[in-house]
Regions:
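Active-site-adjacent segment of SDR/Rossmann-fold oxidoreductases
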Residues: 50, 71-81
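Substrate-binding pocket helix/loop in short-chain dehydrogenase/reductase
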Residues: 1-2, 6-11
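C-terminal helical subdomain
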Residues: 85-86, 102-151
Length: 155
């Protein structure tokens, strides 16, 4: 709960999920702009758009990163930068086992087989680096979208 949240944990989420994205972009963009091209892909989350109990720090930090991705697209597209985000959804990783054990919100109630395989985000990220993803520049792509899964060749 936000009222009982740990300020240090909140700060860590902002440092990693928001400031980490900022520092990565800030370090790479000058070089990309100088060469006239480059691709930036950020990792978003459905939590950037939907508040979840017990995850205020994660939701807020991911929402900030999603907006930064849009801002980078607005600032860089005309200068040759390709910027977009990927919201992979829930991926079958150790993190999901930890979330399940926490019992905090509806994500913890999901069955293991409801999570997507880790290979799907990896394959999608590679696809996003190609010209085939150009119609999606400036957007956040969600692997929950069956149409995207088909476009990428996952299903």
């Amino acid at each position: 709960m936000l009222a009982e949240s740990d300020p240090e944990a909140w700060g860590d989420a902002i440092d990693i999920n928001l400031k980490g994205v900022y520092h990565g972009m800030r370090a790479a963009m000058p070089h990309m702009l100088k060469q006239g091209h480059g691709t930036i892909i950020t990792i978003s989350s459905g939590a950037a758009h939907n508040a979840l109990e017990g995850w205020s720090h994660y939701c807020a930090s991911k929402a900030g990163a999603a907006m930064m991705t849009k801002a980078a697209h607005v600032e860089g597209a005309a200068k040759g930068l390709r910027v977009m985000g990927l919201s992979p959804g829930t991926v079958a990783t150790q993190m999901q086992r930890e979330i399940k054990a926490s019992g905090v919100n509806p994500v913890s109630e999901m069955n293991w087989e409801d999570h997507i395989p880790a290979e799907w985000p990896a394959r999608t990220l590679l696809w996003m680096c190609s010209a085939a993803a150009d119609p999606f520049l400036g957007q956040e792509l969600a692997l929950r979208d069956e149409g995207l899964r088909k476009t990428v060749g996952l299903i």
